[in-house]
Amino acid sequence: MELVMKDAECALTVSETTFGRDFNEALVHQVVVAYAAGARQGTRAQKSRAEVKASRKKPWRQKGTGRARAGSVKSPIWRSGGITFAAKPQDHSQKVNKKMYQGALKSILSELVRQNRLIVVETFSVEKPKTKLLIQKLKEMSLRDVLIVTEEVDENLFLAARNLYKVDVRDAAGIDPVSLISFDKVVMTGNAVKQLEEMLA
């Protein structure tokens, strides 16, 4: 199959297994959930009644005071007491096979092509690290919410884009399923497309 280049009067021949496969929603969902789970810190920690540092003495005698029974100031129903089911640090990561991850990326790329959300260009750069220059370039292409994927991240382009809302710059090796589905359009250079194809072959 062929992808038409927007800034050149030619087409780029690409593999149908990478850019023309059916959309596997279940697989994409599983990989995206696993990716998001892997990004969680999982460092939250609370103290149970056994871990709270406090007196072990019974606050008042069992009978005769007219007050409710109390055996410990560490009780979860007391202020400053322990947490009943205290959260502990845990690893939230989920196992995703390489084949599944690549399959999800191929599904997303193919769906972007079908929805005309993937724009292939020969090159994409700015002369200086100026946000104004990038805004002008994006306006000319009628783009606002966009992920720019190049073979290697150009420093000028990265600096120009980092202060823009809903604009991100990645190299082909650094893209992930969440980034691809988070933007309205994806602009990709021809070399980045070829590099992606080799990675997912």
Swiss-Prot record:
Q: Where is this region: Disordered?
A: 44-73
Output the SUPFAM superfamilies linked to this UniProt entry.
Ribosomal protein L4
**Keyword set includes RNA-binding:** yes
Q: Name one GO cellular component term.
A: ribonucleoprotein complex
**Xref: Gene3D superfamilies:** 3.40.1370.10
One GO BP annotation is:
translation
Q: Where is the composition biased (Basic residues)?
A: 55-66
Entry keywords, A to Z: Ribonucleoprotein, Ribosomal protein, RNA-binding, rRNA-binding
- This protein's record includes keyword Ribonucleoprotein: yes
Which molecular function GO terms apply here?
A: rRNA binding; structural constituent of ribosome
Q: Kindly give the InterPro entries that the UniProt entry links to this protein.
A: Ribosomal_uL4 (IPR002136), Ribosomal_uL4-like (IPR013005), Ribosomal_uL4_dom_sf (IPR023574)
Q: Which domain of life is it from?
A: Bacteria
What NCBIfam families is this protein classified in? rplD_bact
Which family does this protein fall into?
Answer: Belongs to the universal ribosomal protein uL4 family.
The record's note on quaternary structure and interaction partners says:
Part of the 50S ribosomal subunit.
What is the purpose of this protein?
A: One of the primary rRNA binding proteins, this protein initially binds near the 5'-end of the 23S rRNA. It is important during the early stages of 50S assembly. It makes multiple contacts with different domains of the 23S rRNA in the assembled 50S subunit and ribosome.
Protein's UniProt name: Large ribosomal subunit protein uL4
Source organism (scientific name): Hamiltonella defensa subsp. Acyrthosiphon pisum (strain 5AT)
Organism ancestry: Bacteria, Pseudomonadati, Pseudomonadota, Gammaproteobacteria, Enterobacterales
- Gene field: rplD
